C-alpha cells in the first residue's frame, strides 16, 4: 500500500461526531476536478458502531443535487486502517488526528495504489487553521498526490447542503 500507517492506536469513540472537509488531495485531478467528481465527498459525521467499525456520513453531488450517503468502514487488525467498499476504493487509513481539532484520512485502492488516492483534512470547526493545514501538507509529502484543494470556511459551509 502507498499510505504509511503512522498512527499506533486510534480511539474510535473519540473520533465520533461532526466534522468538516476543509481540504482534499488526490493522485489524479479527475478524482476531484468538479463538484460531481467521483471522490469529491464531504464528510459530515463519523459514527463508531458497537463492533468497532466506523460509519461515515457524507454528502456528494449527484444529478445536480446534493445527496447524503452512508459508508461503512470495517475494522481490520490495524486500528487506523479500515476496509471500505466505495467506488473503486477499498481501504481507508487514518493518517493522524488529535481528536479535538483535526483528522486526516486517505482512501485508496490497494490493488492499484498509485492510481486512485484521495486524502482529506477534516476539522471539527469551520475556523481556518494554518497550523493544521501545514500539518496536512506535511503528511501528504510522502504520498503521490499531485492535486490539492483547500476550502475557506465560507465555501465549506456552502459546499453541499441538503
From Swiss-Prot:
Which cystines does this chain contain?
66-160, 106-119
One Pfam match, given by its short name, reads Lipocalin
Q: Which UniProt keywords apply?
A: Disulfide bond, Milk protein, Retinol-binding, Secreted, Transport
- What is one term from the GO cellular component aspect held by the record? extracellular region
* Location(s), subcellular: Secreted
Give the principal location in a single coarse category: secreted
- Source organism, top-level taxon: Eukaryota
Fill in the subunit field for this protein: Monomer.
Query: Which family, according to the similarity comment?
Result: Belongs to the calycin superfamily. Lipocalin family.
Q: Which PANTHER family match?
A: GLYCODELIN (PTHR11430:SF117), LIPOCALIN (PTHR11430)
Write out the function statement from the record.
Answer: Lactoglobulin is the primary component of whey, it binds retinol and is probably involved in the transport of that molecule.
What is the official name of this protein in its record? Beta-lactoglobulin-1
Q: What lineage does the source organism belong to?
A: Eukaryota, Metazoa, Chordata, Craniata, Vertebrata
